[in-house]
């Protein structure tokens, strides 16, 4: 007899009234091994340009019933794109708003993946000891070595990033200076930082995690309650077009903004980003 896994969110004892996803939702949406493939870049980039990763530094996301969702950056959404970019020759730096360590959704870590886990261990210190984003922003100019800004997904991207003036300044710099902006799933919530000023992303099309899907996840205990706001609705208000209404692993390129719809798009987004950046910088 098959025992049905529980759909009740699991208690996170590190914080009051906080919860991890249910056993059932983890069985449906996580895997001990990723779908990493196609890492084939025979002529990698050899220059000085690199990636700036803007990571999440807060773990707990309040839901509508007062319960906290224990979140952060999704490991697959973070590590697979970076694996491709690193293999293509692009090093990366990590920054958070506070300068404090990156928070990961460790419950989604592909802990048996023989390629991704060594890559994570090799670069863990960058996530544990990130730069403070304000310090990075203060140093940005037309000659800065960052070729792209990458905002990983995970619900942690909903916390702080959409209101951050430093995130807005970094994105503004990237777009004005013809750099790449890469993001997926909930990461594009960071684009909301641009809504209170000049919005250079007005009219852009992207892929992102659908609001409709976020509204369904509490039913299986992925989150302990419903979100108090939905980033897709807000992105549309600031003139952005979300081209997907489902989750298929879709990726999209609009000029130099490269996006994906979910963790299922992480590998494809990594390929797309590596190919586009190699064409731009190593062509």
Curated annotation (Swiss-Prot):
SUPFAM superfamilies: Class I glutamine amidotransferase-like (SSF52317). It catalyses: N(omega)-(1-hydroxy-2-oxopropyl)-L-arginyl-[protein] + H2O = lactate + L-arginyl-[protein] + H(+); N(6)-(1-hydroxy-2-oxopropyl)-L-lysyl-[protein] + H2O = lactate + L-lysyl-[protein] + H(+); S-(1-hydroxy-2-oxopropyl)-L-cysteinyl-[protein] + H2O = lactate + L-cysteinyl-[protein] + H(+); N(omega)-(1-hydroxy-2-oxoethyl)-L-arginyl-[protein] + H2O = L-arginyl-[protein] + glycolate + H(+). The keyword Zinc applies. Zn(2+) binds at residues 86, 91, 123. InterPro entries: Class_I_gatase-like, HchA, Prot/Nucl_acid_deglycase. Keywords: Cytoplasm, DNA damage, DNA repair, Hydrolase, Metal-binding, Stress response, Zinc. Belongs to the peptidase C56 family. HchA subfamily. This is Protein/nucleic acid deglycase HchA. It comes from Escherichia coli O1:K1 / APEC. The lineage of its organism: Bacteria, Pseudomonadati, Pseudomonadota, Gammaproteobacteria, Enterobacterales.
């Amino acid at each position: 007899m098959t025992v049905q896994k529980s759909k009740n969110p699991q208690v996170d004892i590190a914080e009051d009234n906080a919860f991890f996803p249910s056993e059932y939702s983890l069985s449906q949406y996580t895997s001990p091994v990723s779908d990493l493939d196609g890492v084939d870049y025979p002529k990698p980039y050899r220059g000085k340009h690199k990636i700036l990763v803007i990571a999440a530094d807060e773990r707990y996301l309040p839901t509508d019933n007062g319960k906290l969702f224990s979140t952060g950056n999704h490991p697959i959404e973070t590590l697979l794109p970076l694996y491709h970019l690193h293999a293509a020759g692009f090093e990366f730096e990590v920054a958070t708003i506070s300068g404090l360590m990156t928070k990961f959704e460790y419950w989604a870590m592909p802990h048996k993946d023989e390629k991704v886990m060594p890559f994570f261990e090799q670069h863990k210190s960058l996530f544990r000891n990130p730069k403070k984003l304000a310090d990075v922003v203060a140093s940005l100019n037309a000659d800065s070595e960052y070729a792209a800004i990458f905002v990983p997904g995970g619900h942690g991207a909903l916390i702080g990033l959409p209101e951050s003036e430093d995130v807005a300044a970094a994105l503004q710099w990237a777009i004005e200076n013809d750099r790449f902006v890469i993001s997926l799933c909930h990461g594009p919530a960071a684009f909301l930082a641009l809504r209170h000023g000049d919005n250079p992303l007005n009219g852009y099309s992207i892929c992102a995690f659908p609001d409709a899907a976020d509204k369904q996840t509490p039913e299986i205990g992925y989150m302990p309650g419903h979100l108090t706001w939905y980033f897709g609705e807000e992105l549309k208000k600031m003139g952005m077009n979300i081209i997907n209404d489902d989750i298929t692993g879709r990726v999209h390129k609009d000029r130099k903004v490269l996006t994906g719809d979910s963790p299922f798009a992480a590998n494809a987004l990594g390929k797309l980003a590596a190919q586009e950046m190699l064409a731009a910088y190593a062509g």
